[in-house]
Structure formats: C-alpha cells, structure tokens
C-alpha cells in the first residue's frame, strides 16, 4: 500500500508522467477486443442490433473469435508490461528537490496585464488587455493546460477528466436510429458525443481532451459490446479529428474565442468576458466552416466504414446492397454522391447544434477554468 501511494504521488508531481496516460488507450483496446470476442462466442455470432443483424454471420471455423482473442491478449499483455516497466523506471529516477519546484513555479508565471491608457486617476475607466502569445506559446499552453504547477489545479483537472469521460460516455449511449436515406436504407448516429469535447478544451486542455476522445469509444464498446471494433475505431478517429479541427479553426484561424478584459472602476479591478461585434461575426463564420467540414469528414468516415464492416475493400466485386435492390450499391458514383450529400447535411446540422451549445456556455466554462486555476 505504501508503494502504491508513493507511485501515485510521483505520478502527480512529475510532469513527464502524463505520457503514461497514453497507455490507457491500448489497454482499453485490448480489454474491449477480449470482451467483444467473449460476447461473440457466447451469442454464437448472432447479435440483433436493429437493421444490422445481417452483419453478425456466424463463422463456422470461429476464425474471427480466435483473431479477436489473440490480438486483444497481445495488446493487453504489452500494455501492462510497458506500464510496469515505466513505473519501475520512474521510481528509480532521481527526485526533484522542492526548491527547484518552487523556483520553476516562480519563473513560469502568467503573462502580465498591460494598460491601454497612459494616465488614469481615481474614478477613471481604463481597460487592461492581456499580452498576446505566439502560436507556439499558445499551443503549448493549451495542449498541457497548465501555466504553473499547482497540486490543487492538478487535482481539479484529474477530477474533471473523470467527469468529462463519464458525461461523454453517457451521451455516446444516446443513439438516434432510423434516419432514412433517399434509397430506402437507414443509418443511426450519436448526436451529443462530441459536444463535451468542445467544452473540455477550455477546462482540461487539448492533451487531456484528446485522451477523452480516444478512450471513450472503447469504453462504449466495453459497456455496449454489440458494436464492432471497427465502429469504435471509426468513432475514435472521427472524434479526434473533429476536436483538432475545432481547436485550430476556432482558436487560431478565426480567433473567435471570447475576450477577457479587466477594467478599473474607482481604483478597483473588475474582470469580465466580452463578445465584441468582430468576435460575434468570427463565431458565426467559424460555426459554418467547422460544422460543414466536420460533417463531411464524418460522412466520409461512414462511407468507408460500410466497406470495412460489410465487405473487402480490395475487391470491387463485393458491393453493398440496400433493400435487395440491384444497382443501388455504393460503388455507383451517383449513389456515392447522394450518400455523401445526405450524411454531410445530417452531420452538419448535428455540429451546428453542438457549436451553438458551446457558444451558449463558453463564458461559464472560462470562468470555471479561471476560478479553479486550471489555466
């Protein structure tokens, strides 16, 4: 027990230990593959999941079960071995003195405020703006979400990551089925799963939010193992790409984030978040661009996902048929165009609602991050 407490304290105090969190991803992949193989074996390969019942044809030689068990076991073994070796090397590493930690905290301070007005007297109204950071400095600060070391902020961030994973997992379980496409087939999708990721960027930083995006689909498969590992892989890649597209377009390309100002009234500082007219227009254009771009990417992922689940990508002879109708496959160029247009429109509406939700709570999210010292 004492060794575990010492290891946990070292993981909290050493900033390089965050790389160990990346091992959670292959760990979850290995566990979910094993559980998926168990479910597939116990149900004899037949799992009813709406209109996708035909995707679960029983293999007579149980080749799929063997592959799933072997791959999952190998990934799980190497992940646990890597984690144990990393923890062993971490405990053998030289300890950092408390004086060095205090000195690092004092030298890595937040940028100071600069007064816009030259002279002001008691009762005057003056506006303070924060010093602009370069792209490299801003990206580093957003990625690690830490301007200075603090046990309290690290504890808050750890708790928030757990809460965000739970919220994202709960919302990913809400699936909207029965979206009928023009040729008669229907698809289902998750409507709220990426909304939490947009909010989490300003709470726990880009690195922790990326971990949430990579981990949640495998937790979903762990709880709801009637999906395929391919669908979890699709949602993992899609959520990760959507998150980074949102970050670079919203915070760097359009610079549409809310502006934080500090005013001095009667010789007393007063901070507030302001959406100027320029900021509102940039928010509007960023909403349109991000929504349509992310909608197209998710629709394109659905298109390739059908080939990975239902057929062999390398063989053009394996086509996807809907409702038993001939010439209604997704090899035909016109059907591909209609499919991408339909899915892009549906997913774009989804991301528009998620972006509007983010805009409505943006100020509250920034206030929470400032209050708990997360930035």
Curated annotation (Swiss-Prot):
Membrane-spanning intervals of the chain: 21-41, 66-86, 160-180, 203-223, 234-254, 289-309, 338-358
GO cellular component: plasma membrane
Membrane topology label: Multi-pass membrane protein
Knockout mutant characteristics: Probably essential, it was not disrupted in a global transposon mutagenesis study.
UniProt keyword annotation of Transmembrane helix present: yes
Predominant place of localization: membrane
Keyword Cytoplasm annotated: no
Keywords on record: Cell membrane, Membrane, Transmembrane, Transmembrane helix
Annotated compartments: Cell membrane
UniProt cross-references to InterPro entries, sorted A to Z: MPN160_family (IPR055000)
Taxonomic superkingdom: Bacteria
Name by which UniProt lists this protein: Uncharacterized protein MG147
Species this chain originates from: Mycoplasma genitalium (strain ATCC 33530 / DSM 19775 / NCTC 10195 / G37) (Mycoplasmoides genitalium)
Organism lineage: Bacteria, Bacillati, Mycoplasmatota, Mycoplasmoidales, Mycoplasmoidaceae
């Amino acid at each position: 027990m004492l060794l575990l407490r010492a290891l946990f304290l070292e993981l909290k105090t050493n900033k390089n230990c965050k790389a160990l969190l990346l091992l959670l991803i292959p760990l979850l992949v290995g566990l979910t593959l094993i559980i998926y193989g168990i479910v597939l074996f116990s149900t004899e390969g037949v799992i009813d999941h709406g209109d996708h019942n035909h995707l679960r044809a029983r293999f007579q030689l149980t080749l799929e079960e063997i592959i799933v068990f072997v791959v999952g076991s190998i990934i799980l073994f190497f992940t646990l071995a890597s984690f144990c070796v990393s923890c062993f090397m971490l405990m053998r590493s030289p300890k950092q003195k408390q004086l060095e930690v205090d000195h690092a905290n004092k030298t890595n301070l937040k940028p100071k405020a600069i007064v816009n007005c030259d002279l002001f007297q008691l009762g005057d109204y003056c506006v303070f703006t924060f010093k602009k950071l370069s792209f490299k400095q801003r990206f580093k600060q957003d990625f690690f979400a830490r301007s200075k070391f603090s046990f309290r902020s690290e504890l808050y961030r750890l708790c928030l990551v757990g809460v965000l994973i739970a919220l994202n997992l709960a919302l990913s379980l809400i699936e909207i089925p029965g979206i009928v496409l023009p040729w008669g087939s229907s698809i289902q999708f998750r409507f709220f799963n990426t909304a939490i990721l947009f909010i989490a960027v300003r709470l726990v930083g880009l690195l922790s939010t990326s971990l949430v995006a990579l981990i949640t689909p495998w937790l979903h498969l762990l709880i709801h193992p009637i999906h395929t590992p391919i669908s979890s892989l699709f949602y993992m890649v899609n959520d990760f790409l959507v998150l980074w597209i949102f970050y670079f377009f919203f915070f760097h390309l359009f610079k549409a984030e809310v502006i934080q100002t500090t005013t001095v009234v009667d010789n007393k500082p007063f901070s507030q978040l302001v959406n100027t007219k320029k900021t509102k227009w940039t928010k509007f254009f960023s909403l349109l661009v991000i929504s349509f771009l992310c909608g197209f990417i998710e629709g394109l992922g659905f298109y390739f996902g059908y080939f990975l689940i239902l057929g062999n990508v390398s063989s053009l002879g394996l086509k996807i048929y809907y409702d038993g109708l001939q010439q209604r496959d997704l090899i035909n160029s016109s059907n591909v165009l209609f499919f991408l247009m339909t899915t892009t429109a549906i997913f774009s509406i989804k991301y528009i609602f998620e972006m509007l939700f983010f805009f409505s709570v943006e100020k509250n999210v920034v206030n929470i991050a400032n209050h708990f010292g997360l930035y």
